[in-house]
Amino acid sequence: MFAPIDPVKIPVVSNPWITMGTLIGYLLFVLKLGPKIMEHRKPFHLNGVIRIYNIFQILYNGLILVLGVHFLFVLKAYQISCIVSLPMDHKYKDRERLICTLYLVNKFVDLVETIFFVLRKKDRQISFLHVFHHFAMAFFGYLYYCFHGYGGVAFPQCLLNTAVHVIMYAYYYLSSISKEVQRSLWWKKYITIAQLVQFAIILLHCTITLAQPNCAVNRPLTYGCGSLSAFFAVIFSQFYYHNYIKPGKKSAKQNKN
């Protein structure tokens, strides 16, 4: 089993049995067990719980974002052109560990969203994109932590992700207030656009990093980050096309006829 290389470990998450068991349990519940349990039951009304969850996610991701921006641009702990993890004896190493720990733990908190979908019988939202995205972010985040430790090339990429999540969960919270408020929110599709921009920036960042022969990053992991972002860009583009472009073309064709 994988063992983290940094001597300072994340409680619970650093245990490979608990982590992998959680991820396998997540897949089993959302794809098989959960729908089976809910098959002959009425959907749960979880509006209050979901609002609290959304507020928590806004505050949690906002905290990571503020800490990360301060770390990058105020403390200037990294050389932006070539971001490598801080050495073990660096004065800001504990801060790097804290920010990365908060981020990785949040990827497991994100899994709760799919469980809400199952309990509310929102089967349409339990798509391949949704499940794979949540699973992959937690799984590959854990692998990065095991094989690389804290920080490094993925650090600014994670901050981009938290910024998008603040916007996304703000939308979720506002849309949960009432149907009238939900209908007035015109910027839903721009969340997907923000995600696509995020993946493009990550891919560009990985490419620029790898193009520097003297940049001592972990190259296999940097290739992995770039490849995963490219794959996400493809499946999110497909989602955007089928949900926002294709319906518009169909509507225009019907109006023309």
UniProtKB/Swiss-Prot annotation:
GO annotation, cellular component aspect: endoplasmic reticulum membrane
Catalyzed reactions: a very-long-chain acyl-CoA + malonyl-CoA + H(+) = a very-long-chain 3-oxoacyl-CoA + CO2 + CoA
Record carries keyword Metal-binding: no
The keyword Hydrolase appears for this protein: no
GO molecular function: fatty acid elongase activity
Sequence intervals crossing the membrane: 10-30, 55-75, 98-118, 135-155, 158-178, 191-211, 221-241
Its membrane topology: Multi-pass membrane protein
EC top class named in words: transferase
Primary site of residence: endoplasmic reticulum
Keywords on record: Behavior, Endoplasmic reticulum, Fatty acid biosynthesis, Fatty acid metabolism, Lipid biosynthesis, Lipid metabolism, Membrane, Transferase, Transmembrane, Transmembrane helix
Domain of life: Eukaryota
Disruption phenotype: RNAi-mediated knockdown results in an altered hydrocarbon profile in females, with significantly increased levels of C25 7,11-dienes and reduced levels of C27 7,11-dienes. Monounsaturated and saturated hydrocarbon levels are also affected with increased levels of C23 fatty acids and reduced levels of C27 fatty acids. Males have a normal hydrocarbon profile. RNAi-mediated knockdown in females (mated to wild-type males) results in impaired courtship behavior with reduced numbers of copulation attempts and increased copulation latency.
The protein, known as: Very long chain fatty acid elongase F
